[in-house]
Amino acid sequence: MKTLKTLKIFIIVFIASVSLASFAGFGESCSSLPTTSDGYLETDTAYGYIIRNIDMKDPRGNCNSVASSITFCFKNVEGSSSPCTMYTLNEGDSKKISDLSTDNNPDLGANPVLKNIVLTVKKWDNDLCLVMPTSRGPMPVACKSLSATPTPPPSEDKNCNIGKSCYTGANYSQSLINFSGLAVQCLSETLNKIFFAGKSCSAQDQNSRITNLAAFSTFQGYLKRIIGAALILYTMFFAFNMALNTEYASTEKIALFVIKFLFVAYFSIGLGPLDFSGGQPTKENGMLKYGLPLLTGAAPDFAQMIFNAAGSRGLCQFDNSKYKDGYKFYGLWDAIDCRIGYYLGLDLLYNIDKNRVLGNVVGNGPRGNNTPIPNFDPEGKNDRPKDLSKAGALRFFTVMFGFFMAGNVIILAAGLVFSVIFLSILLYFITHYLVCMITIYVMTYISPIFIPMALFTRTKAYFDGWLKVCISCALQPAVVAGFIALLITMYDSAIFKNCEFLRYDYERGDIRFSTFELRLPVGGADKCQESFGYKMLEYYAGKGWEEHLLILFPIKSIVRDVVSILAELLCVLVFSVIFYYFSKSIGRFASDLTNGPNMDAVTASPTKIVGLVKKGAAFLKDAAMASQGKPLVGDKPGVGGKRKEGEQQGGDLASGSGGGK
């Protein structure tokens, strides 16, 4: 009997053990899981507890390496009909533990600490794993091997060092001619990738010619110990002062100590981890979260605020509400690009939809006369040059050539000088803004070096200098923008006088743009018709051109309103020369006003550009004289000979006086 009972107990224990092994081999994975060196996650956190409640080695073929899904058995509550419930999740699927514990297991799905943990299926090296967030980053709780090494997905950002807006930035502009806003956005995104993104190009990319700097977080890590030592020294010095002087124990001193301590820690190495998004602990750095956006955003905001107060009524004034979020700064640069195109006679900005092929438009602005002025499709269009009919042509230079063919060289010279000075001043503003933006990014990148210097009296001057440069670079573009706004106001008043402009807004998918149509004001229409800008638009339309025969070749020139055009253009030229000479000191004025560095040495100043134009003109003149066999100006006896003779006499006198000593 005893033998029979013993055998019976043995059979029951064997069956129970086999069933437990078959249906509840919890904590087993098809592939080995990574382990931590101290075993902390596996023993003392929810990570190890969840591993011990998952079974993968079930007799149902869960370890199949061909399937692109993962199957596992999740433990049920004690006393359930089945020890666990099977689940199959595809790659990329995510489930909360509360969704997997269908029977409200109080140890899992109903546990307030565990129920909101998200399990995600993703590739982990050569395995497909069920991953959960931990304090040390995402970690797998169950894995299986794949049949072959997966091919890495192609990177979405093929141009890893170049901002995406360098290729798509034109879609955010409302001006049909846009290059300055595109340059600003392209440079901003590229600097952000180089300094802060922390994603370098693949080592196999042989076409890459730009090497990323270490990411800002990596750079912070290098200085973490140094900054920590500075904070410890600061605390020790303050404690010594409190022990030796009771005045340091006051509430004011203690509050100032705490504020400076937190300021340096938050803006230099960051506080945290404050965010566990995706299980990855991240630090919150005040310089990246508040400092950089504030400094880079202040420059265009101040500049646009001043710039929008200038200009003619309705000309190149875009609707700011139609810019996408994060791209409203394009309004400033669109206004500049639009005026460049409008002053130089770009047809696209004026009559883009004369055949109404774009559908409905919305007109905004003062309407005045309801007839478009002038008519861009005159009956005598055969008299005008063919260049005026080309889309996208800069008609200003075609009209200047028409005056030249009529013998009006002074008008041609005045027009070319105006265009060179106007473009050089605007180019100076653009380059000045870009240099200031680059400086702000560099100052932000090296901020972990200078911010801790605010703790000590002997090093605070370095911090003050760093802060001074940052604030100055944020304000200098606003000062230069005020100068440009005044220039634009004077140009609009001199060129278009009291003319008004009607804006037409177009939308084609995600692309939005506007054109501007000149309209006569209700009162004082004669003054607008006598303006230089109105007459130039008539020339662009083909009015005022005459055809003549020069020997055997027909030429087209402009002989109408020559005197009035010359007077108006000379008035514009006077303003241009005044602003040209004033632009020589605007950079120094902006630096003195903001108490920062002078950027003229690294910008395209108008004087440099005009100097290059002068050198080019002198070179062409010398080349023309040399081709005709004439002596150059410096080789003439009446000029160069006297100068050389005087130099020789001066040298003889100097040598004679030296010998007499």
UniProtKB/Swiss-Prot annotation:
Signal peptide region: 1-24
Keywords: Cell membrane, Membrane, Signal, Transmembrane, Transmembrane helix
GO BP field: protein secretion by the type IV secretion system
Subcellular location: Cell membrane
Gene Ontology CC: plasma membrane
Transmembrane segments: 226-246, 254-274, 410-430, 436-456, 469-489, 562-582
Pfam hit, one: TrbL
UniProt superkingdom: Bacteria
Region of interest (Disordered), residue spans: 629-661
Record carries keyword Nucleotide-binding: no
Protein topology in the membrane: Multi-pass membrane protein
Disulfide bonds: none
Record family assignment: Belongs to the TrbL/VirB6 family.
Protein name, entry field: Uncharacterized protein RC0143
